[in-house]
């Protein structure tokens, strides 16, 4: 049922199918004409950016400069970003902020319909101070004498005023006199000095916004924002911008892993900027107001949250589809680049669109919410940005990918031919098939393509220049169309309490004392600069002259070219055009060179063709080998490298792991496939191993990442081993199904019959008498007496304590239980015995032994040499009396009492027959043979099956199956027991990490380490092994006693011979 459910769940729905079809159609059209798509998108984005720039920056600067030139001051310029406060009985004599900034009052005159007794304006004049600048005392005297309507109030110093060396003066003036006061404060001449305080940007030559002045203005605005911001806000924004740039870095690193060092990541960022321009255009056209401050604060958060995962996923899918088209399994079915892109969109397109839809829906919900502040406006803008980003991903970025893949393919196919031409070898041109974007082309087509590329970029630059030439002739003509832009990009309102708190306190005291209702408009700080008067006069004179000498068209063009962003974009576009054309011109030149080579005769062409192809292929493969890009070669090429000895077969996993688009599992599976081919084609064994490549030994759908470096080397596949479940069997009061991996028929069935008989008597009972793994190193000394001294020291309490301390320091689970030594001439054998937790423990105890021997050398035995860390005194994987007597691993005894009725009904025999059989066969017969630990029927069968099923070391079956089976007649019932002193199992490490074996451990409930008592899981597994042996011994002895063993094996475990014909 599981496969059916999976299939049903994976079936795409109607929306999925039709959405993917639409995406495929869009991408297909973009891939047919990728250059047109790129140029049109860039042209639209540039036009959008230019309109935004003209409406927000250029026209604003032009208006301000023209007004200053005519000495006409516009109060609305100073009111932008201001805030209005009111005080009176209606506000309970508390300052209340109006909902809208003063910049909106010009648009909505109804704002002033609510009359008040007094309407004041608070002006903060900011002067930079330094050691060379004169003081501002003269400025204060000038204000007192010349501005009768203005009053000095307490200034509010900024937290960062001392850092930036600024001094301010705060004035309170009637709102009706604001324009007059501002006009008189444009310039404060210094008496007996050649300098004067001049209002920033006042009186400059109307020559357009220079780059240096623009940068200074931006820097000053930035500093002003910092001075009036809280420290925590600054820290948060710094962290946001840092995280945003880390996101950019992650994008470049991800694209570099996919094989692109710069261009793909750059294209993703460029697509993001285009989306921002389009989103701003739609937002401004919709009348939604979003300030530049809000953009600068929220855009980093949007970049961090959304990220660039979608373009990376699409790129990875396209590269994978392109790589699959070059697999050796389908040498004649290579996809074109548009086909590879279409396959990638079929796989990932719908998921990407679904993610975009979810994000846009969340932003749309935020845009329609009633949350106070700028969040709804920014959500509206962000939703449009993501919408355009999704459209550009499947048009603009898909075109970039198409061009990138085509250029890579052209270079890959042309490099071998270039190598041949350098050696004066002709390959002919009959079979050369040059395809660009899936269509067959000639050299003339490529030349025409280059012309269109260059012409397209030149055309769009000319159009942009023309649009600007005729666009800024009169600012007033354009203002109705750009009003929305001006509203959108206007400065954010200031915080009046940070700018003029002390001045507001003075007004509050006066108004409350006189009981006068008051409205106060707090203007943003007005900056002043110190200028030379002579230079100021020259600038005033040069203004009209500049306008006269230069035409309006030329001024607009120069102003546009001086813009810091547009100029960079023009340079970037021209550079991109140059790079693309360089690639295409090289491809066209190589193609033309190839067509100019005329073969002398058909015989020469045919003879040269094969040899030249082989030579070119060999050179290309060798070059990629030297560059460390073997994983990008085809399988057949890698096989040839292995057979030539250029690549070691055992290192294929490490080599394939470097593939940029393959997962680690896919790379390892590919390595196994290649190694099978190498083994099959190795010349020295090809007569016997040639069948492996196409044999039925499986190698796919297996997790080789778990095997690599842990379980096996030189992997050529895996062998499915049948696994049966015997039982259930009650062991110490709990039911278990016992997994057995075996190819011997009747074994699982026999064990299941034994389980049934044991359950009839209440189940099996197990006990563990000992738990300790052993390791016996061999030590050599210069003389027998030195070996004896070492033996005495090891057997002493002091020696045991020192060795135990050193041994136990190597692991938190290893605890030395005992030492046993034996001397043979100058050789000394020491048997370490230690607990090892839930691990089988061979590696753990070996590490402890090495540490103990190292410490022993420092206690008077520096002349000792270690022959081997294992001296066969352990004893490991060999039958030995010492294991039978002292035990190794888990020493387990299991017993069961079988009722006489169950013996007759289930086992088909009687108690006395079983007792006599066991005595004669298992005890006397094994003694006659001189067996060590072999006093059983077939304990090794059961032990090996359980060890294989649970991921144990199968070789440990040699000592683990040491067993003595005892049967007794107790009150006409059968009492059976098995004693097994050397069960060596673990539940962590080794083969237990493999998924199938781990699943069998889960079946027994003993997977991994025990959570509270280390070692309990491994001991429980040893109990289960002993109980399984108990069931197997019981059933097989019964079959022997009843004479059923041979007939059962003949019926279930004998190969059927094919019938003879003819």
From Swiss-Prot:
Reactions it catalyzes: (R)-mevalonate + 2 NADP(+) + CoA = (3S)-3-hydroxy-3-methylglutaryl-CoA + 2 NADPH + 2 H(+)
Pathway(s) it belongs to: Metabolic intermediate biosynthesis; (R)-mevalonate biosynthesis; (R)-mevalonate from acetyl-CoA: step 3/3
Glycosylation sites: 61, 484
Residues on Cytoplasmic side: 1-34, 252-261, 309-355, 399-450, 586-1062
InterPro entries: HMG-CoA_N_dom, HMG_CoA_Rdtase, HMG_CoA_Rdtase_cat_sf, HMG_CoA_Rdtase_CS, HMG_CoA_Rdtase_eu_arc, HMG_CoA_Rdtase_N, HMG_CoA_Rdtase_NAD(P)-bd_sf, HMG_CoA_Rdtase_sub-bd_dom_sf
Residues that, per the record, bind NADP(+): 811-813, 838-846, 1053-1054
Entry GO CC: endoplasmic reticulum membrane; peroxisomal membrane
SSD domain sequence ranges: 233-403
Lineage: Eukaryota, Fungi, Dikarya, Ascomycota, Pezizomycotina
Binding site for CoA: 750-756, 906-908, 1048-1049
Domain of life the protein comes from: Eukaryota
Catalytic residues (positions): 744, 877, 953, 1049
UniProt GO MF annotations: hydroxymethylglutaryl-CoA reductase (NADPH) activity
Keywords attached to this entry: Endoplasmic reticulum, Glycoprotein, Lipid biosynthesis, Lipid metabolism, Membrane, NADP, Oxidoreductase, Steroid biosynthesis, Steroid metabolism, Sterol biosynthesis, Sterol metabolism, Transmembrane, Transmembrane helix
Lumenal side stretches: 56-230, 283-287, 376-377, 472-564
Function as written in the Swiss-Prot or TrEMBL entry: HMG-CoA reductase; part of the first module of ergosterol biosynthesis pathway that includes the early steps of the pathway, conserved across all eukaryotes, and which results in the formation of mevalonate from acetyl-coenzyme A (acetyl-CoA). Hmg1 and hmg2 catalyze the reduction of hydroxymethylglutaryl-CoA (HMG-CoA) to mevalonate. The first module starts with the action of the cytosolic acetyl-CoA acetyltransferase erg10B that catalyzes the formation of acetoacetyl-CoA. The hydroxymethylglutaryl-CoA synthases erg13A and erg13B then condense acetyl-CoA with acetoacetyl-CoA to form HMG-CoA.
Homology family: Belongs to the HMG-CoA reductase family.
E.C. designation(s): 1.1.1.34
Species this chain originates from: Aspergillus fumigatus (strain ATCC MYA-4609 / CBS 101355 / FGSC A1100 / Af293) (Neosartorya fumigata)
TM region positions: 35-55, 231-251, 262-282, 288-308, 356-375, 378-398, 451-471, 565-585
PROSITE patterns hit by this protein: HMG_COA_REDUCTASE_1, HMG_COA_REDUCTASE_2, HMG_COA_REDUCTASE_4, SSD
UniProt main location, coarse: endoplasmic reticulum
GO BP: coenzyme A metabolic process; ergosterol biosynthetic process; isoprenoid biosynthetic process
Membrane topology: Multi-pass membrane protein
SUPFAM superfamilies: NAD-binding domain of HMG-CoA reductase, Substrate-binding domain of HMG-CoA reductase
Keyword Iron assigned: no
UniProt protein name: 3-hydroxy-3-methylglutaryl-coenzyme A reductase 2
Location of the protein in the cell: Endoplasmic reticulum membrane
């Amino acid at each position: 049922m599981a496969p059916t459910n999976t299939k049903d769940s994976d079936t795409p729905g109607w929306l999925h199918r039709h959405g993917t079809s639409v995406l495929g159609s869009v991408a297909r059209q973009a891939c047919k004409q990728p250059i047109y798509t790129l140029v049109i998108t860039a042209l639209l984005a540039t036009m959008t950016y230019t309109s935004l720039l003209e409406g927000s920056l250029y026209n604003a600067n032009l208006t301000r400069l023209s007004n200053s030139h005519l000495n006409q001051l516009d109060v609305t310029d100073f009111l932008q970003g201001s805030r209005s406060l009111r005080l009176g009985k209606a506000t309970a004599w508390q300052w209340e902020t109006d909902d809208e900034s003063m910049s909106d009052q010009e648009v909505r005159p109804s704002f002033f319909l609510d009359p008040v007794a007094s309407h004041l304006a608070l002006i903060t004049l900011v002067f930079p101070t330094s050691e060379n600048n004169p003081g501002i005392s003269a400025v204060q005297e000038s204000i007192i004498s010349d501005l009768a309507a203005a009053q000095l109030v307490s200034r509010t110093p900024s937290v960062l005023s001392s850092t930036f060396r600024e001094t301010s003066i705060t004035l309170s003036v009637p709102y009706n006199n604001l324009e007059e006061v501002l006009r008189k404060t444009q310039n404060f001449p210094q008496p007996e000095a050649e300098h004067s305080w001049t209002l920033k940007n006042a009186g400059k030559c109307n020559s357009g916004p220079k780059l240096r002045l623009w940068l200074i203005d931006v820097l000053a605005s930035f500093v002003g924002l910092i001075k009036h911001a809280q420290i925590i806000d600054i820290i948060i924004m710094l962290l946001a911008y840092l995280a945003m740039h880390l996101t950019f870095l992650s994008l470049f690193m991800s694209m570099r892993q996919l094989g692109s060092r710069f261009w793909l990541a750059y294209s993703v960022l460029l697509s993001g900027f285009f989306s921002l321009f389009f989103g701003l255009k739609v937002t401004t056209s919709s009348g939604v107001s979003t300030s530049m401050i809000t953009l600068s604060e929220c855009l980093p958060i949007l970049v961090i949250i959304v990220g660039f995962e979608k373009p990376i996923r699409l790129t990875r899918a396209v590269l994978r589809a392109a790589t699959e088209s070059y697999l050796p399994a389908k040498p004649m079915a290579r996809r074109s680049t548009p086909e590879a892109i279409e396959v990638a969109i079929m796989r990932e397109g719908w998921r990407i669109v679904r993610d975009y839809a979810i994000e846009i829906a969340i932003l749309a919900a935020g845009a329609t919410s009633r949350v106070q502040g700028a969040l709804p406006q920014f959500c509206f803008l962000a939703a449009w940005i993501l919408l355009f980003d999704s459209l550009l991903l499947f048009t603009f970025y898909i075109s970039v990918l198409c061009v990138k893949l085509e250029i890579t393919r052209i270079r890959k196919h042309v490099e071998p031919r270039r190598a041949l031409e350098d050696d004066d070898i002709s390959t002919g041109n009959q079979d050369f098939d040059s395809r660009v974007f899936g269509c067959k082309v000639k050299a003339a087509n490529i030349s025409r393509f280059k012309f269109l590329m260059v012409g397209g970029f030149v055309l769009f630059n000319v159009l942009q220049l023309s649009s600007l030439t005729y666009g800024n002739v009169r600012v007033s003509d354009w203002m109705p169309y750009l009003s929305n832009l001006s509203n959108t990009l206007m400065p954010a309102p200031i915080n009046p309490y940070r700018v003029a708190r002390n001045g507001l306190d003075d007004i509050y005291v006066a108004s409350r004392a006189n009981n006068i209702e008051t409205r106060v408009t707090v203007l943003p700080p007005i900056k002043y600069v110190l200028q030379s008067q002579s230079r100021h006069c020259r600038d005033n004179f040069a203004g009209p002259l500049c306008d006269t000498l230069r035409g309006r068209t030329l001024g607009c063009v120069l102003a546009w070219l001086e813009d810091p962003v547009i100029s960079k974009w023009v340079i970037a576009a021209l550079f991109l055009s140059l790079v693309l054309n360089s690639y295409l011109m090289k491809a066209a030149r190589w193609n033309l060179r190839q067509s100019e080579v005329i073969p002398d005769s058909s015989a020469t062409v045919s003879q040269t063709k094969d040899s030249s192809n082989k030579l070119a292929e060999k050179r290309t493969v060798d070059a990629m080998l030297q560059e460390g890009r073997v994983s990008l070669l085809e399988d057949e090429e890698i096989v040839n490298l292995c057979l030539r000895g250029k690549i070691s077969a055992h290192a294929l996993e490490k080599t394939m792991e470097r593939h940029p688009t393959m997962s680690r599992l896919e790379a390892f599976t590919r390595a196994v496939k290649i190694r099978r081919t190498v083994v099959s084609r190795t010349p020295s064994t090809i007569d016997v191993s040639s069948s492996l490549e196409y044999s039925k030994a499986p190698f796919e759908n297996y997790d080789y990442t778990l095997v690599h470096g842990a379980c096996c080397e030189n992997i050529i596949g895996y062998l499915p081993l049948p696994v049966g479940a015997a039982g259930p069997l009650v062991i110490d009061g709990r039911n278990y199904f016992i997994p057995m991996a075996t190819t011997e028929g009747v074994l699982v069935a026999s064990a299941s019959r034994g389980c049934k008989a044991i359950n009839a008597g209440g189940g099996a009972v197990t006990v563990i008498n000992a738990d300790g793994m052993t390791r016996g190193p061999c030590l050599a000394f210069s003389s027998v007496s030195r070996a004896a001294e070492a033996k005495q020291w090891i057997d002493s309490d002091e020696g045991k304590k020192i060795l135990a301390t050193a041994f136990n320091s190597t692991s938190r689970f290893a605890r030395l239980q005992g030492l046993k030594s034996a001397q043979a001439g100058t050789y000394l054998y020491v048997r370490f015995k230690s607990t090892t937790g839930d691990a089988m423990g061979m590696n753990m105890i070996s590490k402890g032994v090495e540490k103990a021997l190292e410490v022993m050398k420092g206690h008077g035995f520096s002349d000792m040499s270690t022959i081997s860390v294992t001296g066969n005194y352990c004893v490991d994987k060999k039958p030995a009396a010492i294991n039978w007597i002292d035990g190794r691993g888990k020493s387990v005894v299991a017993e069961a009492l079988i009722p006489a009725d169950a013996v007759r009904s289930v086992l088909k025999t009687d108690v006395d027959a079983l007792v006599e059989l066991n005595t004669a066969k298992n005890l006397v017969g094994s003694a006659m043979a001189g067996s060590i630990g072999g006093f059983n029927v077939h304990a090794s069968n059961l032990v090996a099956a359980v060890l294989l099923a649970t991921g144990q070391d199968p070789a440990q079956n040699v000592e683990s199956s040491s067993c003595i089976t005892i049967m007794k007649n107790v009150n006409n019932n059968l009492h059976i027991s098995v004693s097994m002193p050397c069960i060596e199992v673990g539940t962590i490490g080794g083969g237990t990490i493999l998924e199938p074996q781990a699943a069998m451990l889960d079946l027994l409930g003993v997977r991994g380490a025990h959570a509270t008592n280390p070692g309990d899981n491994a001991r429980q597994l040893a109990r289960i092994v002993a109980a399984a042996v108990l069931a197997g011994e019981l059933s097989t002895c019964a079959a022997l006693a009843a004479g059923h063993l041979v007939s059962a094996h003949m019926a279930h475990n004998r190969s059927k011979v094919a019938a003879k014909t003819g």
